Amino acid sequence: AHIDLITGLSSKEVSVDYICKNIHADGIISTKASMINRAKKLGMYTVLRFFLIDSMAIKNIENLGNQHEQLPDVVEVLPGLMPKILKQICKTSKVPVIAGGLISDKEDVMGALGAGAAAVSTTNQKVWEL
């Protein structure tokens, strides 16, 4: 469940408890480390999403796990169209990397995978059929 996008749920840990106990989701996607930490404690699969807006976002990925927080199972970086940056992130990340956001064709997919991404995420159904 992409917990940040569920209308009516707050960005508090109790929302993760609700998703786990009532919805029985296997995992969550979130931009918030506190939500990821709670989900990990509940035994859920976690994807921590990062929007690559500047070099600080890249540093935050590199520093994952340095503050005694639990590591997510995977990080997702958006947009996923920057092979040079993706390659750098994949080399330094402590967990697998998913490239997402603005992936629109086979070239985008191959560029992300070639840069080291473990997977590609997209809502573009044409890409699903490649």
Label every model-predicted segment:
Residues 22-23, 42, 67-70, 92, ...:
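Structural motif
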Residues 36-41, 88-92, 111-112, 130:
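Short loop/helix-cap segments at secondary-structure boundaries that form the rim of catalytic
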Residues 79-85, 101-130:
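Glycine-rich phosphate-binding active-site loops on the catalytic face of alpha/beta enzymes
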